[in-house]
């Protein structure tokens, strides 16, 4: 019995050995026959370090199939064949390949049909005897070399390598090993761990290892224990169930299959794995060939990989694998596929080569046991793992059309080849013919371009046909595509009037636009710079030369191509903006990457577009077909530049030598017709610290950024500038620049100061109208005048000062209002807008801040997840992991914390309306969406800090450090008393911070965490449905994870705040450590005690200190005195405007400073009142004139009034000294001077004064009574000699008897010395008539007027006129009456008061000083009148005197 059992076992073992022998049949002898078909190596002289084809003699016909297949039969000696190129239509492509004449074997059928004929033994053999046939199964030598002067591959050799469908895989090596064959992988061990020793980026993560699985994938983490079909990734129950990270080329349970002895490729079935590292520096032959083949396959197969150079390559091959669960005969039903991984440790590309697919599914997935048909086919795609994201390659994955993988793809022209980019996102590089849906993702690169156009966009999506038209639609513009191959078309982006993300769609033939994507349009001023200016000469007025450079490979790789350099300009004279061609700078020039522009070559140009003052340089190919043989040409644009270097001679001929002034004046006139926009702009912060903290309204200016662009060409002296993040309602933009001391720079002080802009760089919707085009309108309205008014003129020019002071003046910070700030950090801790600090460990999604004002809505929400376990187990605390926000009608922005192992490149994920956006390129640092601007600092590439600015002035900042986030919200003052949420109500009152959704205020104790949790925090939890007062969640939902996945209202965190109260007594070290790390910061101590994580504690303290300092900085009221204008033609020695600042002034040479030389800023925010007037600078000549006029003015305004006052004073003094009769009144006389003189001659009354007070005649009032109060009591009576009493004012020769000075005497008719009175006709009046009144007048009878004593009636007008005609003497002598016959005044010789010629006594009688009684009263003189004296010399004679001698005519009685 035992013998029988032994025989049975022996037979069984023998049978198994036979089966295994057939399964793993050796092909060494067969390979030796093929290799030895050439009896001796052919020695060919080749140049050093260069591979050449081996020229072999013509060979005899190939041996028969039976002889070749029989391992016992030796092949006949073959002559040396000759390699000749022949056109071979391959089943894997249409490329021309090389074959061997006379040795083309017949097609063999079996488990595997190679894509190309097996020609390995006929390729070149090196000195070591190795055959470099691409299909050779023996691995090359492992002698890596990096020495200079190594192997150089030729274009022919590269074409030969790339003509093969499959990459290298070897089952032998030159040292007797198994090559790449993984003999340890079999049914009982389906995977092997492989160390890569380099970083492999994959789906956001990065790995330095992998696991090679027999089941058709490379994995990086453990799969779930049980799989259910169809497979769904990511695993929704993660982390309860494992969610593997893998690359699945054919994810299905497999086993090693078998091959037939008749198969051409007799390499051992199974799994192969090969790694080639450090290819960038290798010079050995195999390393160079692997690098070049992989590089060009990827560059030409995937859009956007034009600069990719592989650093490491992994080749994994599954050869002749069968499905699991099948019968023995099913082992011959096999699939062969290959995965090629290439990475430079930043980008990763994968090539899937499907050679043969004969089965679809294994038995556990429902497939049959014989053919592997039916059931759920294999999974093809990628899974990031850890429950994050996955990509399933549709329509092939888990679908019956999966067998078409071997006939689709068309990457590099091969059916069955599919290429993907997998480092951050999965981007397909192969066409997809069978998929159909309403919206299909379009793969294109680059994903952004200059607004001016010319960007070549490579597009992959549907499978293309050269006979079918392809239309590309960029926003509102459409262009036709250019066919490249079945997998790619090219569209050249047209000129677009838009910015930000626009719709990008294509249609094939007559189909609708169902392939769609988002294309980012870069504004010309912020676009990727492709033409560089080595100096700033292009901005000058008249440069000698301008040097430009560019990357020649941005146009073409053809070194012999020529380029054309042209000049373009822009203007806005109509509603539609005009970007027009100006001139050709160089018609044809070698594409060398540099050129020198000589402006003197264009002096004589007379261009019709000379009104254009700024424009662009454009470089394109002279012959478009030089770009990859296609009739297209890329276009390179410069940044906007001024055009004085080209247009200056033309402007000078048109406007004269002062053409800059003319251009400036034209702009000023036009700008004055436009509306004033400055009132709409936010005010500039006073200091740089305030500007940096105002995250809601201001962002760094690209032109002057302290972190990325400190040159500040148009703001010299500035170290940093900020601009308003979003356009205001009218489209304007604010700019604020700060000097090295952190103070605001003003245009009132210098031309380099802050300048507001009429048009924002982002433009304004709609972008296709004048004054609304991004960048171009800003340059037309704001940048262009800066050059013509200031940069090309003097700073003190009239146009520049008009530009600085009137049209673009800086806005000072007198009324600036710092924003309110609130934040969340740690596990988590909150600081409200009013400064209340508390802790709330909610688990789920909550409202951080929201507006209760319906007109200005905004929402900021946060997601909190539980912290990972620590050494002691579960941590009863949470942390912030995501923030979502939205304005009134703006785009929804979400910022997420990336998984731990996915933070190697990007720290945070940013989603705009659910679509991931990235900020890893300069032109993408600032991205504008509908109503919101998102940017990352220019010095960061890892997206660890993201700032979101809404058009309402709201800002949200999210910062990540070591996996721990903080979120801060910045609000302008218009939201005071209009906020709610976990950040409280901003009212400057801490008592109402805990406002509930219903508007009530919860009265809570900050130390009672349980009460805060249950009575306040949990009330703000979000759900996916709208809740009154709370709202709905804004977060993007992926893979079925709704708000309930994150929320847990029953979560009970630790409610004890002090670590000393909740840490066990045996953990005193942790308590001491917390105090050591945190000091007195309770939030830091709490976080360390809860998590034992030093990083969390450190950044909790850092975030807390930061927000407290921010609130303290913004709480301080900054006092500013505002603008203090610089005098024209002068300067200020300091630009400070803070309290205590003392600013001194100086003038330029040739000018004089007048006014205050120094002003001081007071503590009340006002400049001190000038003591000497407004400060200004005058030219010396003007200053001299001013001084002279001031002196003359002083003379007239000071000395003359002073003299007048002196005269008046003397006059008043003399008036007081005069003696006058109090009873006397001057009779009423006509106003005529002549009449007055005649009347005075007819009057003969006693005057109360002897003479005038001065030579200046003063009008007297003759209706008054003057009293002299004489004689004086106690004084002697003195008799004065008689004098000439009355002279006319024209008698200038009359000399007083008391001196030599001429004296003007009053024109009065005096009484005679005897006291005899005359009537109104000059006749004596008898004083012995007591019954008659002397003062009686006939007119008094009618008027009833009673005149005082001594009043004499004036002459009638007729009498006065008659008397005027007599031409009487000024002395009123008697000669007048003798010579005038018409006069009624008769000379009376008996009159005591007259001489013989009718003269008047010089001095009156002494009776004039006394009051005269009425005529009816007899009076006796007090003393006898002296003898009258006569003076006949020096007095004018009457004109009609008839004296016999001249002495008689000129004499006057004295």
Swiss-Prot record:
Membrane disposition: Single-pass type I membrane protein
Localization in the cell: Cell junction, Septate junction; Apicolateral cell membrane
Iron-sulfur found in the keyword field: no
Every Sushi domain range: 1119-1179
Record-given protein name: Protein mesh
Record's function text: Required, together with Ssk and Tsp2A, for the proper organization of smooth septate junctions (sSJs), probably by mediating cell adhesion via its homophilic interaction. Also required for the correct subcellular localization of several sSJ components, such as Ssk, cora and l(2)gl, and for the barrier function of the midgut epithelium. Required for maintaining the three-layered structure of the proventriculus.
Subunit record text: Forms a complex with Ssk and Tsp2A. Interacts with Ssk; the interaction may be necessary for the localization of both proteins to the cell apicolateral region.
Cytoplasmic-facing ranges: 1208-1454
InterPro entries per UniProt: AMOP_dom, C8-3_MUC4, Epithelial_Barrier/Signaling, Ig-like_fold, Ig_E-set, NIDO_dom, Sushi/SCR/CCP_sf, Sushi_SCR_CCP_dom
Cystines in this chain: 1121-1161, 1147-1177
GO biological process annotation, one example: cell-matrix adhesion
Glycosylation sites: 24, 208, 320, 386, 458, 554, 620, 888, 942, 977, 985, 1048, 1066
Signal peptide span: 1-21
């Amino acid at each position: 019995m035992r013998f029988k059992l032994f025989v049975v076992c022996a037979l069984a073992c023998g049978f198994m050995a036979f089966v295994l022998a057939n399964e793993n049949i050796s092909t060494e002898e067969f390979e030796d026959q093929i290799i030895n078909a050439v009896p001796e190596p052919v020695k060919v002289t080749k140049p050093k370090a260069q591979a050449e084809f081996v020229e072999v003699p013509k060979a005899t016909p190939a041996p028969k199939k039976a002889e070749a297949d029989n391992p016992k039969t030796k092949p006949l000696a073959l002559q040396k064949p000759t390699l000749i190129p022949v056109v071979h239509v391959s089943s894997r492509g249409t490329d021309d390949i090389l074959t061997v004449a006379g040795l083309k074997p017949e097609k063999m059928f079996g488990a595997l049909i190679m894509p190309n004929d097996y020609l390995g033994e006929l390729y070149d053999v090196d000195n070591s005897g190795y055959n470099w046939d691409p299909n050779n199964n023996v691995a090359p030598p492992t002698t890596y070399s990096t020495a200079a002067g190594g192997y150089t591959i030729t274009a022919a050799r590269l074409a030969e390598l790339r003509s093969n469908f499959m990459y290298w895989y070897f089952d032998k090596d030159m040292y007797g090993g198994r090559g790449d064959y993984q003999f340890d992988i079999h049914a009982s061990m389906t995977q092997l761990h492989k160390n890569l020793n380099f970083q492999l980026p994959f789906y956001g993560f990065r790995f330095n290892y992998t696991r090679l699985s027999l089941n058709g994938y490379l994995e990086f983490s453990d799969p779930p224990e049980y799989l259910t079909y169809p497979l769904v990734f990511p695993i929704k129950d993660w982390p309860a169930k494992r969610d593997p990270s893998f690359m699945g080329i054919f994810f299905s349970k497999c086993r090693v299959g078998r091959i037939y002895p008749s198969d051409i490729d007799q390499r051992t079935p199974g799994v192969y794995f090969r790694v080639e590292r450090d290819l960038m520096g290798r010079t050995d032959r195999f390393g160079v060939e692997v690098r070049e083949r992989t590089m060009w396959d990827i560059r030409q197969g995937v859009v956007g990989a034009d600069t990719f150079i592989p650093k490491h390559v992994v080749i994994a091959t599954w050869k002749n694998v069968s499905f699991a669960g099948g019968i023995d005969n099913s082992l011959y039903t096999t699939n062969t596929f290959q995965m090629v991984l290439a990475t430079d440790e930043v980008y990763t590309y994968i090539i899937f080569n499907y050679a043969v697919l004969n089965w679809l599914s294994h038995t556990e997935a429902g497939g049959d046991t014989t053919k592997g048909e039916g059931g759920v086919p294999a999974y093809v795609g990628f899974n990031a793992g850890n429950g994050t994201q996955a990509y399933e390659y549709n329509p092939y994955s888990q679908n019956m059309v999966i067998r078409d993988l071997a006939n689709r793809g068309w990457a590099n022209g091969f059916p069955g080849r599919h290429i993907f980019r997998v480092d951050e996102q999965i981007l397909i590089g192969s066409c997809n013919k069978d998929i159909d849906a309403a919206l299909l993702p379009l793969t294109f690169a680059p994903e952004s371009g200059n607004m001016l156009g010319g960007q070549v966009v490579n597009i992959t999506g549907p499978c293309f046909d050269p006979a079918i038209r392809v239309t590309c639609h960029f926003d509102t513009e459409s262009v036709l595509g250019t066919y490249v191959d079945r997998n790619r078309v090219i569209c050249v982006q047209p000129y677009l009037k838009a910015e930000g993300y626009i719709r990008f769609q294509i249609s094939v033939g007559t189909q609708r636009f169902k392939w769609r994507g988002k294309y980012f349009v870069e504004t010309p001023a912020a676009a990727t710079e492709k033409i560089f200016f080595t100096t700033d000469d292009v901005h000058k007025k008249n440069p000698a030369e301008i040097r430009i450079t560019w990357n020649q490979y941005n146009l073409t790789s053809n070194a012999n191509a020529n380029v054309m350099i042209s000049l373009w300009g822009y203007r806005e004279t109509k509603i539609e903006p005009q970007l027009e061609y100006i001139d050709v700078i160089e018609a044809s020039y070698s594409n060398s990457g540099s050129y020198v522009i000589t402006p003197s070559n264009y002096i004589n140009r007379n261009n019709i577009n000379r009104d254009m003052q700024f424009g662009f340089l454009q470089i394109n190919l002279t012959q478009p077909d030089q770009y990859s043989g296609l009739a297209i040409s890329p276009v390179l644009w410069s940044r906007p530049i001024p055009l004085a270097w080209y247009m200056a001679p033309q402007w000078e001929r048109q406007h004269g030598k002062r053409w800059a002034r003319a251009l400036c004046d034209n702009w000023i006139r036009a700008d004055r017709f436009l509306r004033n926009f400055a009132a709409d702009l936010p005010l500039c912060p006073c200091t740089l610290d305030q500007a940096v903290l105002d995250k809601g309204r201001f962002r760094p200016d690209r032109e002057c950024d302290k972190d990325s662009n400190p040159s500040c060409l148009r703001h010299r002296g500035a170290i940093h500038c900020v601009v308003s993040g979003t356009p205001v309602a009218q489209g304007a933009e604010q700019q604020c620049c700060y000097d090295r001391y952190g103070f605001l720079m003003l245009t009132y002080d210098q031309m380099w100061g802050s300048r507001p802009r009429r048009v924002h760089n982002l433009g304004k919707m709609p972008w296709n109208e004048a004054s609304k085009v991004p960048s171009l309108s800003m340059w037309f309205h704001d940048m262009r005048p800066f050059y013509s008014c200031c940069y090309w003129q003097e700073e003190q020019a009239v146009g520049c000062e008009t530009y600085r002071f009137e049209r673009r003046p800086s806005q000072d910070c007198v009324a600036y209002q710092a924003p309110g700030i609130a934040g969340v950090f740690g596990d988590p801790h909150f600081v409200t807008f009013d400064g209340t600090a508390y802790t709330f460990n909610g688990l789920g999604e909550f409202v951080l801040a929201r507006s209760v004002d319906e007109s200005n809505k905004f929402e900021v929400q946060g997601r909190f997840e539980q912290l990972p376990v620590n050494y002691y187990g579960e941590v009863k605390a949470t942390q912030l992991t995501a923030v979502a926000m939205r304005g009134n009608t703006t785009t929804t922005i979400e910022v997420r914390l990336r998984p731990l192992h996915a933070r190697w490149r990007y720290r945070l994920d940013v989603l705009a309306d659910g679509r991931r956006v990235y900020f890893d390129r300069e032109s993408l640092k600032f991205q504008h969406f509908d109503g919101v601007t998102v940017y990352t600092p220019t010095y960061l590439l890892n997206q660890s800090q993201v700032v979101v600015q809404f058009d309402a002035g709201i800002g949200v900042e999210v910062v990540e450090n070591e996996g721990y986030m903080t979120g801060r919200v910045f609000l302008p003052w218009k939201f005071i008393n209009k906020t709610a949420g976990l950040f409280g109500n901003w009212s400057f009152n801490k008592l109402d911070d805990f406002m509930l959704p219903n508007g009530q205020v919860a009265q809570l104790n900050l130390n009672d965490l349980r009460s805060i949790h249950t009575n306040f925090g949990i009330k703000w939890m979000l759900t996916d449905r709208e809740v009154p007062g709370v709202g709905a969640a804004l977060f993007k939902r992926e893979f079925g994870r709704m708000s309930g996945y994150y929320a847990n209202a029953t979560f009970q965190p630790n409610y004890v705040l002090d670590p000393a109260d909740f840490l066990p007594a045996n953990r005193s070290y942790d308590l001491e450590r917390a105090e050591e790390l945190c000091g007195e910061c309770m939030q830091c101590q709490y976080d360390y005690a809860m998590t034992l994580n030093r990083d969390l504690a450190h950044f909790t303290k850092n975030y807390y200190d930061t927000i407290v300092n921010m609130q303290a900085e913004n709480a301080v009221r900054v006092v500013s005195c505002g603008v203090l204008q610089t005098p024209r033609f002068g300067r200020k020695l300091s630009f400070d405007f803070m309290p205590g600042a003392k600013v001194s002034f100086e003038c330029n040479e040739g000018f004089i400073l007048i006014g205050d030389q120094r002003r001081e800023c007071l503590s009340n925010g006002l400049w001190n009142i000038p003591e000497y007037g407004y400060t200004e600078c005058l030219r010396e000549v003007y200053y001299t004139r001013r001084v002279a006029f001031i002196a003359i003015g002083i003379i007239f305004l000071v000395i003359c009034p002073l003299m007048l006052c002196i005269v008046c004073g003397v006059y008043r003094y003399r008036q007081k000294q005069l003696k006058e009769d109090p009873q006397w009144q001057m009779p009423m006389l006509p106003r005529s001077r002549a009449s007055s003189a005649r009347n005075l001659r007819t009057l003969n009354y006693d005057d109360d004064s002897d003479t005038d007070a001065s030579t200046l005649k003063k009008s007297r009032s003759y209706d008054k009574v003057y009293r002299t109060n004489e004689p004086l009591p106690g004084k002697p009576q003195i008799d004065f000699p008689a004098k000439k009493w009355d002279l006319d004012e024209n008698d200038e020769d009359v000399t007083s008897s008391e001196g030599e000075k001429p004296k003007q005497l009053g024109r009065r008719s005096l009484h005679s010395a005897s006291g005899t009175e005359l009537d109104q006709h000059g006749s004596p009046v008898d004083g012995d008539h007591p019954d008659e009144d002397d003062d009686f007048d006939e007119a008094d009878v009618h008027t009833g007027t009673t005149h005082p004593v001594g009043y004499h009636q004036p002459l009638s007008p007729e009498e006065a006129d008659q008397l005027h005609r007599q031409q009487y003497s000024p002395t009123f002598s008697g000669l007048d009456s003798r010579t005038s016959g018409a006069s009624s005044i008769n000379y009376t010789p008996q009159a005591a008061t007259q001489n013989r010629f009718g003269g008047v006594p010089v001095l009156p009688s002494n009776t004039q000083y006394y009051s005269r009684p009425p005529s009816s009263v007899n009076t006796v003189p007090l003393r006898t009148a002296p003898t009258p004296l006569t003076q006949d010399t020096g007095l004018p004679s009457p004109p009609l005197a008839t004296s016999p001698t001249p002495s008689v005519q000129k004499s006057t009685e004295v």
